[in-house]
Amino acid sequence: LVLSLLLITWLLESLGIDLNAARWAFSPSEGWPLGEQQPWKWIHRYGTIPGFLLTLAAIPAWFFCQRSQRYYASRRYVLIYGLTSIIGAGILVNALLKEHSGRPRPRDVVEFGGSWEYRDALDFGTPGKGRSFPCGHCTMGFSFSVGIVFWQRSRLLASGMFFLGLFYGALVSVARVTQGAHFVSDGVWALGVLMLTLSVLYYFVFKPPLSEKQDFSPMPAKQQRRLFSGILLAMFVMTGLYITRRPFYQDFQKKFTLPLRAESLLLQTNLEKERFELVPLDGKSPMIHLEGRGFALPDTNFRVDFSLPKSGDIPVIRLELERNGYFAELETRV
């Protein structure tokens, strides 16, 4: 499975499919017009709900199987289905890889009007500087494919869910490409991470075929409550860590002009002077480039107030940074 993913990734990069697919959806004059049309707009807004609800339903379904003699043999299959989406989609894709891979989205790269450099799928960059790899929305589309886990119980159900997931996940992937939010390889790896997670849980952790013939022995109610409380606590802790230790990156660039005979500058700022570095531009237009990185809650950012107020003989540059939201840590460099 890993070799297949690496081979597909190599082919996508060698043939230029990632950039070519984005070029197909991009218009230099309009941006990403396809992404604003239906059904792509609807899929972006509501497309994750079916997969999320099915994943959510897997936990109470597992408790039901634990207490039902008829469905007792299916308990581990149901548990694997739920955990694959929680671990693969929730933790590995959205909490770890997306936040730390540092791959800019198509709409953020220079080729499509952005300011960041394009990176290949496995060419990891600065954490927080782009959250393209893998595609989070796509994992919820492909999550139906995890139903292949039920092959031993019902081949019709398993194959139906698998192909439904492939179709729906591909549909979500196309929607995200049309919106300039993801490359094709981001969708491929969304499916890949889910299948890798499923394989580990199935073959190395739970091994459900070995438990099918076990006698019916329902878990005591007290033990079930403890287990359920433990799962809730673990999810609460992971959510807290995710939202407070989420990598953050934002930059600001601005070109400006100075009087030809200016020999000095006066800088007015609320940033520490140790954060500034002067770089010779070899005759190019003066430019200020501010980078901010750290850890912050979702939807947190900063606003940069840059101006050149008129003064006497010495040119003045005014640069102030205003934080919007909660930063657990923020380091700036100008």
Residue ranges and their predicted role:
Residues 1-130, 139-167, 172-173:
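Hydrophobic alpha-helical bundle signature of multipass membrane enzymes
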Residues 56-65, 199-207, 239-242:
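Alpha-helical transmembrane segments
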Residues 67, 174-179, 245-246:
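Juxtamembrane "helix-exit" motif on the non-cytosolic side of transmembrane helices
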Residues 85, 98, 133, 182, ...:
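Residue-level signal for helical boundary/lining positions with a hydrophobic bias
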Residues 105, 140, 189, 275-277:
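Short hydrophobic/aromatic residue motifs in ordered secondary structure
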Residues 119-227:
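Membrane-embedded catalytic cores of phosphoryl/pyrophosphoryl-handling enzymes
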Residues 242-266, 271-334:
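Acidic (Asp/Glu) and glycine-rich low-complexity loops/linkers
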